[in-house]
Amino acid sequence: KYFYADQYSNDANWQAHYLTTAEEIWTQTKGKITHFVAGLGTTGTFVGTGRRLKELGNVQLISLQPDHPFHPLEGWKHLATAHRPGIYDDTIADTTLIIDSSGVFDIIRSISIHERLFISPSGAANLLGALEVASQIKEGDIVTTLADTLDRYQEVRKEIFGI
């Protein structure tokens, strides 16, 4: 016997973020969040969190996609060339930004040096997206997610740090 979660088509994926991630963000920002920025993989984080944040307030939702199909962002989808997840709702995003995936390793290196955080490639891409949004607005409270750490990406660690 086995269980296949099918996170790309399982409504429980986005519902978990609707019920938990969005509420945590709303509570921790005291409702001051103005922009939510997240990359699209299974799309559960973006769809669930985005739906709930839209209900709670006037939050701009910015989805992120890699700049080409052959990118280093494990888990992310280049939706123009990939199979669209069944749970994806393309009406939710106010804006979609295309992330230059070549800058991801520089962000990982910089954040590790200056903040002592070892973020994953997808986390670095989310951070790039949040920084892009920050450069386009006068003020606001921008939130993104860092879903995992660099621990799972031995080849990336080797390429960036030689370890």
Predicted regions and their residues:
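Hydrophobic/aromatic residues located in beta-strands of well-ordered beta-sheets
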Residues: Y4, F36, N58-I62, I142
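Short glycine/serine/threonine-rich phosphate/pyrophosphate-binding segments
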Residues: L40-G50, S122-A130, Y153
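Active-site/ligand-binding loops adjacent to catalytic centers
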Residues: K1, K54-P121, Q136, R157-I163
